[in-house]
Structure formats: structure tokens, C-alpha cells
From Swiss-Prot:
It comes from Shewanella baltica (strain OS185). Its EC number is 2.4.2.21. Pathway: Nucleoside biosynthesis; alpha-ribazole biosynthesis; alpha-ribazole from 5,6-dimethylbenzimidazole: step 1/2. It catalyses: 5,6-dimethylbenzimidazole + nicotinate beta-D-ribonucleotide = alpha-ribazole 5'-phosphate + nicotinate + H(+). GO terms for molecular function: nicotinate-nucleotide-dimethylbenzimidazole phosphoribosyltransferase activity. Belongs to the CobT family. This is Nicotinate-nucleotide--dimethylbenzimidazole phosphoribosyltransferase. Transmembrane segments: none annotated. The active site is at E327 (proton acceptor). PANTHER family: NICOTINATE-NUCLEOTIDE--DIMETHYLBENZIMIDAZOLE PHOSPHORIBOSYLTRANSFERASE. SUPFAM superfamilies: Nicotinate mononucleotide:5,6-dimethylbenzimidazole phosphoribosyltransferase (CobT).
Length: 360
């Protein structure tokens, strides 16, 4: 039975009321712009939440909220790993998924610290984890095809992944969640992300490929060669963003892309983690450009090419910590900054409230 094509209807946020929102920000008891990037973040959040409220014509009266923030970590394996493009074998994906379920990974620690609910989704690791609670089964297969030899997956598998992702987001939306963050786990997924980046941005592979979690120079050369072979093999088939995912992507990247689109469709804020999640965002923006309005980019990772992708998406990340772990760790660490933007917008006094002469 074939999977029907999945489409998303994403409304752009309205910028018509930006002057009123900006005025509210500027009249807080501080010099204009003194809170730096927190101010532009508050403006973005106010655009999204005023558009989705009954006060779209009076956005300055909208009380900003972060409700039930949820971290979704998507896991999948990659056929290209058999060629030795990573320091770790594919089995580590499964072992780390178990670690997530048992609460022992960095993402677990950070989510507990900042107040994220964490869900782990098996999108297609080689061997499913059985008998362990807390892992959501949304498997599209047992690892992707090796992209230098064959497509990662069929085009209809992409739509199946999008449909699963939409259902996942709908469940959280119905529970009242209005902010979702995206992380991933998949040995070899920097290869898939770099291939996606090269295909969409029309860049040389060498400008997109990095050392992942720390490969040596010999392995890096092999990684470069295999991705170049993949792009050459699929050149004629790369006719659009979905075909890029089908030829070059990963099951976890497909479902991240679909979940970003579904969350934006529901006017939820979307926090994008590092290199892999940004590759998913890159595809999502190609499918539905309006999704960009809802994306908050958490950090610039230490992975080669991430800065280029962020610049292409006109994104200014909140953090730059030299992270190269993935899992959603950077997105988790960004949540307190997002909450700080909401809190100053809602709670700071204006000059008139405080009886202070304005410095605007």
C-alpha cells in the first residue's frame, strides 16, 4: 500500500504589529537594545504567539508563555557507517538510545536541569530496543541504505515519516505544549547531513564535511570521497527537498523535518539544536519557507559547515559553546535564555510604571 504525499499548511507570522511589540520592548526600564539578542528573541516569540491569540491587533497585550516544553530526540542508523566514516560502529546508536531511556546521557541531565520533558523516538535503528520503557516506536526500517550505493530510502518512506512526525506533534499540541526542541542520535548522521547540505546549498563537499565526533584525517578523506560518490550517484534524482531526503537522508532526519513542519503548522515554537537538526531545518525551509518564522536556533556547533548553514538560513544562534555531541544538548541549554526573553517581556516594568525618565 503506497503512502500518500503529506503536505503542510504553514501560515507566516504577521509582522504588521512589530512597531507595537518593539515599542513595548523599548519602553522597559533599560536603554533600547541593552538586552541584546534576548530582545530580538522576544520579538520573534511575540510575533508567533500574538498571531495565534485573540489579540493579534494588540500584540503588546499578549502575555508570552512557554508551556510544557518538550525535547524530542530522534534516532536512526545509517548504511554508510559500514564503510568506516565514524569513530563508532552502528551498535552505539542502540546503546545510546538505551542510555537515554535509562536517564544517563547528557541530554537527560540537561533536560532535568532546565525543565524539558524528554521523549526518545526510534525512527529506524538497526536493532530495536525491546523491554525498555520510554522509547517511542516510529520505525521506518532497520537503518538506511548506504547512500553512496543506493538511495537512503524510498520517496514514499519520506511521506510515511512525515505522517508519523505529524501525529507525534499533534499529540503534544493537544496536551498544551507550545515549544518543541529537536535532538538526534545516529552514528553516521553527520555524513547524511553534510550530503543534504551540499545538495541543497550547491556547495563543494569539502565545505560541508567535518570530523563529526572526532574522526582522524584518513577517515575524513574516506567520508569526503563517499559523500562525493553519493552526490554523483543521485545527481539526476535530486529534484526537490523530499528527493534529497530520500536519496541522502536518515530516518531521524526525515522525522525531524516533518516534526518541524508540523509544529510550525500548529504555531508552536521550534528550537533547533546543532548540525544535524539544522540540516533538517534546511530541508523544512525548502519545503515550506514560512517554517523559518517559528525556528529558534539554539547554538553554533563545532562541526564544520554548521556556520555556513546558519548563515544560509539567516540565523543567529543563541549560544556558541564548541559543542559537537548532538542529542539536543545545545537546544536544552538554550531553554533558560528563551524563558528569560519571555520573562523580561512579561515582567519588566516600563519607564512610566517605575516612575523613571525614559532614555529612549
Amino acid at each position: 500500500m503506497s503512502q500518500s504525499a503529506v503536505s503542510f499548511q504553514i501560515s507566516p507570522v504577521s509582522k504588521a504589529q512589530d512597531p507595537l511589540i518593539q515599542q513595548k520592548i523599548d519602553l522597559k526600564t533599560k536603554p533600547p537594545g541593552a538586552l541584546g539578542q534576548l530582545e530580538s528573541l522576544a520579538l520573534q516569540i511575540a510575533r508567533v504567539q500574538a498571531t495565534d491569540s485573540q489579540q493579534a491587533d494588540q500584540p503588546q497585550n499578549t502575555v508570552l508563555k512557554i508551556v510544557h516544553p518538550t525535547m524530542l530526540v530522534f534516532a536512526g542508523d545509517h548504511g554508510i557507517v559500514a564503510e568506516g566514516v565514524s569513530i563508532a560502529p552502528s551498535e552505539v546508536t542502540r546503546q545510546m538510545v538505551q542510555n537515554f531511556a535509562h536517564g544517563g546521557a547528557a541530554i537527560n541531565v540537561f533536560c532535568r536541569q532546565v525543565g524539558f520533558k524528554l521523549e526518545v523516538i526510534d525512527c529506524g535503528i538497526l536493532t530495536p530496543v525491546e523491554g525498555v520503557e520510554g522509547i517511542i516506536d516510529q520505525r521506518l526500517g532497520a537503518g538506511t541504505g548506504a547512500i553512496h550505493l543506493e538511495p537512503a530510502m524510498a520517496l514514499e518512506t519520506v511521506d510515511k515519516g512525515f505522517a508519523m512526525a505529524r501525529d507525534l506533534i499533534e499529540r503534544h499540541h493537544q496536551a498544551g505544549c507550545n515549544l518543541v526542541a529537536f535532538g538526534e542520535m545516529g552514528i553516521g548522521n553527520t555524513s547524511a547531513a553534510a550530503a543534504i547540505m551540499a545538495a541543497i546549498m550547491q556547495l563543494d563537499v569539502i565545505d560541508c564535511v567535518g570530523r563529526g565526533t572526532g574522526i582522524n584525517s584518513e577517515t575524513l578523506e574516506r567520508k569526503l570521497m563517499l559523500i562525493e560518490l553519493a552526490l554523483l550517484l543521485h545527481q539526476s534524482a535530486l529534484t526537490g527537498p523530499k528527493s534529497v531526503l530520500a536519496c541522502l537522508g536518515g530516518f531521524e532526519i526525515v522525522q525531524m523535518t516533518g516534526a518541524m513542519l508540523a509544529a510550525a503548522e500548529r504555531k508552536m515554537l521550534v528550537v533547533v539544536d546543532g548540525f544535524i537538526a539544522t540540516a533538517a531545518a534546511l530541508v523544512a525551509v525548502q519545503i515550506a519557507p514560512n517554517v523559518r518564522d517559528y525556528l529558534i536556533f539554539a547554538h553554533q556547533s563545532d562541526e564544520q559547515g554548521h556556520q555556513r548553514m546558519l548563515e544560509f538560513l539567516q540565523a543567529k544562534p543563541l549560544l556558541s559553546l564548541g559543542l559537537r555531541l548532538g542529542e539536543g544538548t545545545g537546544a536544552a541549554l538554550a531553554l533558560p535564555l528563551i524563558q528569560a526573553s519571555v520573562n523580561f517581556y512579561n515582567q519588566m516594568a516600563s519607564f512610566s510604571d517605575a516612575g523613571i525618565e525614559a532614555v529612549v
